[in-house]
Structure formats: C-alpha cells, structure tokens
C-alpha cells in the first residue's frame, strides 16, 4: 500500500499583505510548505502532490527541483475541490494523507500515529480539543463515534459548544476518496466544496472513522497573517531549543536562540544568548559559543571556544581551537588543535596549524599555515592578482611581524622570521630573517603644510 500525500497550498494569503504566496513565507529561514514537504519525506511518502493556485511560478521556482507533482487549482472553490485536482495522481490502493502548506509544525510522530489509527479501508482525522474552538470545524459524534464534521458557519448553536475541532489533516483510502469527491456539493454558507463532507459520507457508507491527537495543539496551527507567523516561529524555536537542552546543551536563555537548520550537540555544550545556527552544524563536547555568534554549515570539535559575535561559515575548528571575538571564518577555513584567531581576523580557504595564532586584525586567504606560527596584527595574504587566486604557504614555527604583506604565490620556510612592515614577494628560507621596509630617515626642522585660507 502506497502513501500518497496531497499538500494544499493554493491560498493567496491576502492577510499577509505580500506578493509572496502564503506558503512561501518562512519559519526558521525555510518556507512553511518546505517544512511540510520535508515531514512527508520523513514518512517515506511514495508520492507528493502540491496543489497550488496563486503564485504558481514562484512556487515552482522555489520548490521545482524536488520530486513533486505540481497540480493547479485554477479557482479556489474549497478544500474538497483542491484535493480533487490531484485525483489523476491517486491510485485506488493508496493511502491518501492530506496536509496543509501553511501548517509547518506537524511532527512526523504525530502523522505516524494518525496513519496507525486508520483501520484498513478506513478514515483517520487529526483532531484537537480547544478551550476556545471558535473558527474551527467541529467533530460531530454520536455515541462516541465520529459521524461528521460541521464548519463554524454551518454549525447549530448546540454544535458550536463542541470543543473537539478538525485540524484538516486526515488519512483516507484512495478508491473511496475518489468516489466521495465526485459526490461533493457546495450547498453551504461558503458556497465551497468542503473536504470535511467526506466524513459524513464515510459514516453513511459504514466506513470506520478514527481520530488521533497531537502532543501539542501548535502542531495543527497555520498562519494567516504575520502575527500568527511570528507565533509559529517562536513555537518552532522553543521546540528546537528544548531538543538541544535534552541532547546536552546548556542554553543561557532558551528564548533567545535562532535555529535555522540541523544542529547536533555533544555533552556540556554552552550556548550564550542570540546565537544563530543555519544549515548543518555539529558541536562536539564542551564547546562554548559566545553571545551573538553566527554558525553556518560548520563542524566544531570538542573543547572549542567561539567567542562573542564571531561568524563561522563552512569552516572547521579542531579540538580546543578558539575564534573571536568578532572573528570571521569563511568557507574552507580550518583551525587545527589549539589554534587561535582573535578579533577582526578573517580566514577563507585557509588552514591554521596546531598551536598557531593570529591574534587580531589579519586576513588569511588561500593559505596553508603550519604549526606554532605567530601571525602579527595587520598581516595580509595578498592572494588575488586581479584575475586569479594564489596560495601562500607558511611552514612550522614561523614568526610573522605586524603589518606584513605576503604576496602570493609565496612560501615561507620553517623557523623564518618576517620583520614588521615587510612586503614579501619571494620565497623565504628556513630560519632566515627578512626585513623589506624602507630605511628610517630623520629630517630635522620639518614644516608641516599650512592650510590655505578659503
């Protein structure tokens, strides 16, 4: 039996006040609909159909490289009409799971429970009990069994008292669903074809209707405006912060962290406030992350220390390495064990060897730097000639004085010393001292220029 997912994503989202389709608005730096697609993939869905309307070209541009069936709903005539647009992609033997592109926080485990609750050839609906169910469709039961769903605008005063609401998420048998969709009518207050009407049809046909419930109602909430979108963002971040703490991270303030990707942590990790994670980030044991740091697609080994306001992107830090404050590691940068870069040091496609240090104010690009090297303040590897990048090699135990320019391609051999203010353009031999600065001159009685009157 195949799992066939239908994601409803045709709404314009007028209340967002945006040219962007509602489902492309982001939670954790990812479109809401992408969260839904990713969850469907976690369920090993055999087929995913995305029913779209407004902004179809934008949706395809953003999502089109994925294996999806894009299905147009030219007119928004209700949820039942939307699902019916995907009927050509549904086989009789399929289990059809209906999801919503603006409901991004539904967990895989919740959907697994929903699918498990569905009896063979039966229907299962994800429902929630709310203290204030206003605005939602109500689950109508008789003798404890579901017999139908009534929308808010069509509900009687007695039905409005029901606090079990329909989330809209449901699992249905493919063959029966296709038959029910063909029988839908729009004689209701909205003049729409409701998917929820198939529940009454299922009851009339003697089909078993079961329910499942999320651990938290936030899993079924969508976003119709930016206030609700912000609430989803906070809920998502709270969930991810809890996951990190349970995995061994100590968060200085769980409400002040921003996780926009996949973060794995070792034991006794310390994360200060306002840290941002993007992409895939791995933190080893006893790692410390200072306030305001940004980590993107990086691998941080045990005991490493990232000080406040550093940006680490596409980089690796070895055991007990440290960076910052205000350091920037760009893609291809790597600090080996016990290496250190300080404030306002930038590295790109550069390796800093074990125990080497660049304390402050340096640019190290396209460089291979050995062990025990000292990089003085103001050092620059001049790696670009206007057309191509070139490599600088600094071997072990080299001392580079402050304000030194290394014009690549160039090699500095073991134990060499470069005097402050030098511009090095040729290879330096082992244990050599190189000084290239101009000889100091003294001019007595020097008169400074005088400003001319305006």
Curated annotation (Swiss-Prot):
Its cofactor is Mg(2+). It is found in: Cytoplasm. InterPro entries: Bifunctional_GlmU (IPR005882), GlmU-like (IPR050065), GlmU_C_LbH (IPR038009), Hexapep (IPR001451), MobA-like_NTP_Trfase (IPR025877), Nucleotide-diphossugar_trans (IPR029044), Trimer_LpxA-like_sf (IPR011004). Residues 1-226 are annotated as: Pyrophosphorylase. The keyword Thylakoid does not apply. Catalyzes the last two sequential reactions in the de novo biosynthetic pathway for UDP-N-acetylglucosamine (UDP-GlcNAc). The C-terminal domain catalyzes the transfer of acetyl group from acetyl coenzyme A to glucosamine-1-phosphate (GlcN-1-P) to produce N-acetylglucosamine-1-phosphate (GlcNAc-1-P), which is converted into UDP-GlcNAc by the transfer of uridine 5-monophosphate (from uridine 5-triphosphate), a reaction catalyzed by the N-terminal domain. HAMAP family: GlmU. This is Bifunctional protein GlmU.
